């Protein structure tokens, strides 16, 4: 039984929505941001990387993009653009199971530092549900949507059952999803090295072809990583020294109001997640029409008009997080979302692709 514990404080955020917010801020600052474009190969001049050849996946248009500095920030796939060099990433996958909030008493997260094999287990309230995780399994094939192994699912359910109000079963899992970690491998590490022993720090390399490669790290240090990349670029003469300046980030004008201060990511999703843009959301058609828990028609339209959403997956996985919270609900509402996307002018909404994806997030 439980003999004692330690209370501490940590941060929590919505990674996908935060990434979209960063992209929008970049556009506002003058950046050109391309969505749904795939890099096909690098462009060279006199043995130096000077850009990329890309393709717009929606229109099929070929794009030759040139830049003074090309940065390879492709996470676990970083080594695919440095085939002549020693691989620096030892990929690892972490599995997460989502269950209803009643499995965890209260709204505080629970961290169990000791499990049967030495890994930690966490139960974190998030957007009206509870995330259970995680695992640390080496992975070399690097699919875009990795699948959880049966033994990983069994481990999480078994260990969670020892500390939660009641033991969760496979039938209780609303969604299962997997993240890939770009862990940096020391030069002396072997293929047998345990991934949980590898560094979570970032790594930057300037290739002989004049291309910067960065991988590793985590969201907590993303600004420090960006500053480090710019510093390397300036030192290599790829960018001016002035590019390294990282201005402080000011909070939104309403971030300190009593109403905003009460917002928590433990709450079920809703208009409160839009912060100072709630008034914009309220003016869109379908503001009062709920399509699924925490998702309204207006939110779908907002995702297209202001958040660069083009497909059903964009909306249900990367703007709303419904796929990660309740895969069955996401699968059910997908046709309605597809129709709204088409109304908003999106031509290739990829409904069938999303339905297939949603099945892989279901255990039952």
Q: What is each of the regions a protein language model found here?
A:
Residues 1-4:
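Glycine-rich phosphate/pyrophosphate-binding loop
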Residues 7-17, 28-29, 44, 74-76, ...:
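C-terminal accessory subdomains/tails of enzymes that are appended
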Residues 7-8, 53-56:
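Short beta-strand segments that buttress and anchor functional surface loops
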Residues 35-50:
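A conserved short coil-to-beta-strand element within the FAD-binding core of flavoproteins
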Residues 48-52, 107-108:
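Short, hydrophobic/aromatic-rich segments at coil-to-beta transitions
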Residues 58-69:
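Core beta-strand elements of the Rossmann-like FAD/NAD(P) dinucleotide-binding domain
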Residues 72-86:
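Flavin (primarily FAD) binding-site architecture
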Residues 87, 93, 101-104:
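Extended, Lys/Arg-enriched charged tracts that mediate electrostatic binding to polyanionic substrates
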């Amino acid at each position: 039984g439980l003999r004692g514990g330690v209370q501490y404080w940590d941060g929590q955020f919505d990674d996908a929505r935060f990434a979209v917010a960063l992209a929008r801020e970049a556009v506002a600052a003058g950046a050109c941001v391309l969505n749904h474009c795939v890099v096909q190969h690098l462009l060279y001049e006199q043995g130096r990387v000077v850009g990329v050849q890309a393709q717009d996946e929606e229109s099929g248009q070929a794009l030759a993009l040139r830049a003074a500095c090309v940065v390879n920030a492709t996470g676990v796939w970083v080594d695919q653009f440095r085939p002549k060099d020693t691989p620096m990433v030892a990929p690892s996958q972490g599995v997460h199971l989502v269950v209803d909030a009643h499995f965890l008493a209260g709204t505080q997260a629970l961290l169990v530092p000791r499990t049967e094999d030495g890994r930690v287990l966490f139960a974190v309230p998030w957007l009206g549900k509870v995330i259970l995780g995680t695992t640390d399994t080496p992975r070399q094939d690097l699919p875009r949507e990795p699948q959880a192994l049966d033994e990983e699912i069994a481990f999480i359910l078994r260990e969670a059952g020892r500390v939660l109000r009641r033991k969760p079963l496979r039938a209780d899992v609303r969604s299962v999803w997997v993240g890939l970690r770009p862990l940096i491998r020391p030069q002396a590490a072997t293929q047998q090295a345990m991934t949980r022993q590898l560094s979570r720090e970032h790594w930057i390399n300037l290739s002989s072809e004049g291309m910067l490669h960065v991988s590793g790290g985590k969201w907590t240090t993303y600004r420090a990583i960006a500053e480090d990349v710019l510093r390397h670029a300036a030192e290599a003469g790829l960018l001016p020294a002035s590019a390294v300046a990282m201005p402080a980030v000011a909070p939104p004008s309403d971030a300190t109001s009593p109403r905003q201060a009460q917002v928590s990511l433990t709450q079920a999703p809703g208009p409160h997640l839009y912060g100072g843009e709630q008034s914009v959301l309220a003016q869109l058609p379908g503001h009062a029409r709920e399509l699924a828990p925490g998702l309204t028609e207006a939110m779908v339209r907002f995702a297209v008009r202001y958040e660069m959403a083009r497909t059903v997956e964009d909306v249900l996985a990367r703007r709303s997080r419904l796929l990660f919270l309740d895969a069955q609900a996401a699968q059910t509402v997908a046709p309605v979302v597809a129709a709204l996307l088409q109304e908003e002018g999106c031509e290739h909404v990829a409904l069938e692709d999303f339905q297939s994806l949603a099945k892989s997030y279901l255990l039952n």
